[in-house]
Amino acid sequence: MDLRLVLVASPILLAVGWAGFNIGRAAVGQLQLMLKRARG
């Protein structure tokens, strides 16, 4: 594997992972809210 490729790919992977983590966390929060409302 080329070092330049790693240098280019790592920040992209980090950004994608961070975005996915935030989206997942928000989705879990929404699901919990929906469940609370459904139980009411």
From Swiss-Prot:
Coiled coil: none
Keywords recorded for this protein, A-Z: Membrane, Photosynthesis, Photosystem II, Thylakoid, Transmembrane, Transmembrane helix
Keyword Thylakoid: yes
Pfam families hit by this protein: PsbY
Membrane topology summary: Single-pass membrane protein
Self-association state and partner proteins as the record states: PSII is composed of 1 copy each of membrane proteins PsbA, PsbB, PsbC, PsbD, PsbE, PsbF, PsbH, PsbI, PsbJ, PsbK, PsbL, PsbM, PsbT, PsbX, PsbY, PsbZ, Psb30/Ycf12, peripheral proteins PsbO, CyanoQ (PsbQ), PsbU, PsbV and a large number of cofactors. It forms dimeric complexes.
Cited NCBIfam families: PRK13240.1 (NF009711)
Function: Loosely associated component of the core of photosystem II (PSII), it is not always seen in crystals. PSII is a light-driven water plastoquinone oxidoreductase, using light energy to abstract electrons from H(2)O, generating a proton gradient subsequently used for ATP formation.
Protein name (record): Photosystem II reaction center protein Y
Organism: Synechococcus sp. (strain RCC307)
